[in-house]
Amino acid sequence: MICPGMDDFAAALPRVGALAGLDLGTKTIGVAVSDTLRGIATPLRTIRREKFSLDLADLMKTVAERQIAGFVLGLPVNMDGSEGPRAQSTRAFARNLEKLTPLPITFWDERLSTVAAERAMLEADLSRKRRAELVDHVAAGFILQGALDRLAHLGRAHG
């Protein structure tokens, strides 16, 4: 089920359960997961994209292993707030994912998540090669953490 807003997503989730954050690129999918209480996002891995069915099988293996309760997809919105082809591609991925899982799916504005990930890795003094290996799932971690912080805020406001 695709949830248009974070309020809808929060309502569709069970009280506890890990979430998966995805940073969808043309060649890779960065994957991050939260703890079951949804406080901390941890970058997990990068899936090298092949075709949708193989990518999804790989992703669903992680979903089963980690007992994922919902998905947060990074939505690549332009700096002016408009949506371009990459955002449309992300929405199409969500529609295809929705056909294959009952888990709730929402979007999180991913503007500057890759920049933040790069900056954090530069500060950690990682080599260029290592940064290239990690950037996608580290960016997924930034995306998921933003959504987790919003969910925590909503929980405090409603509760």
UniProtKB/Swiss-Prot annotation:
One of its GO terms (cellular component) is cytosol. GO terms for molecular function: nuclease activity. It comes from the Bacteria. It is found in: Cytoplasm. The keyword Nuclease applies. Its main location: cytoplasm. Its EC number is 3.1.-.-. InterPro entries: RNaseH-like_sf, YqgF, YqgF/RNaseH-like_dom, YqgF/RNaseH-like_dom_sf. SMART domains: YqgFc (SM00732). GO terms for biological process: rRNA 5'-end processing. Keywords: Cytoplasm, Hydrolase, Nuclease, Ribosome biogenesis. It is an enzyme of class 3 (hydrolase). SUPFAM superfamilies: Ribonuclease H-like. Belongs to the YqgF nuclease family. Could be a nuclease involved in processing of the 5'-end of pre-16S rRNA. NCBIfam families: RNAse_H_YqgF. This is Putative pre-16S rRNA nuclease. It comes from Rhodobacter capsulatus (strain ATCC BAA-309 / NBRC 16581 / SB1003). The lineage of its organism: Bacteria, Pseudomonadati, Pseudomonadota, Alphaproteobacteria, Rhodobacterales.
